[in-house]
């Protein structure tokens, strides 16, 4: 299905959990994953995560956009920003 092709991944670290994005589970039409870069350093390197949290949206394994936290390690992007991107990506696949 189209939904399974779109993946939203939050990269964060356990020492920054207070700034984690807790609304990701409200997204629809996509798969959601969490990666703790304090534990999975290989993922941090592979995806070049320089600030946490970082939310990366993938379509068929290809990164289409990333949303990065500000200098205070807080995510300024909102649920709507990411849902709109997911919705656009779903529509483009038809």
What role is predicted for each listed range?
Residues 33, 44, 71:
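Generic anion/oxyanion-binding catalytic loop in active/binding sites
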Residues 21-23, 43-46:
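A short acidic, amphipathic alpha-helical/loop segment
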Residues 7-10, 54-56, 66:
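Soluble periplasmic/extracytoplasmic beta-strand elements of cell-envelope proteins
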Residues 57-94:
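Non-catalytic, surface beta->alpha helical segment in thiol-disulfide oxidoreductase systems
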Residues 35-36, 47, 74-78:
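Extracytoplasmic/periplasmic, Sec-exported soluble proteins
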Residues 37-42:
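N-terminal post-signal-peptidase region of extra-cytosolic proteins
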Residues 1-31:
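Local sequence-structure signature of Cys/Sec-based thiol-disulfide redox active-site neighborhoods
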């Amino acid at each position: 299905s189209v939904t399974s092709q779109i993946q939203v991944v939050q990269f964060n670290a356990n020492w920054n959990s207070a700034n984690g994005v807790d609304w990701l589970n409200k997204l629809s039409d996509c798969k959601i994953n969490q990666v703790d870069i304090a534990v999975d350093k290989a993922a941090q390197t592979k995806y070049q995560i320089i600030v946490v949290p970082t939310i990366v949206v993938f379509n068929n394994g290809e990164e289409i956009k990333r949303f990065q936290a500000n200098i205070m390690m807080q995510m300024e992007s909102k649920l709507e920003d990411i849902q709109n991107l997911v919705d656009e990506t779903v529509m483009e696949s038809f």
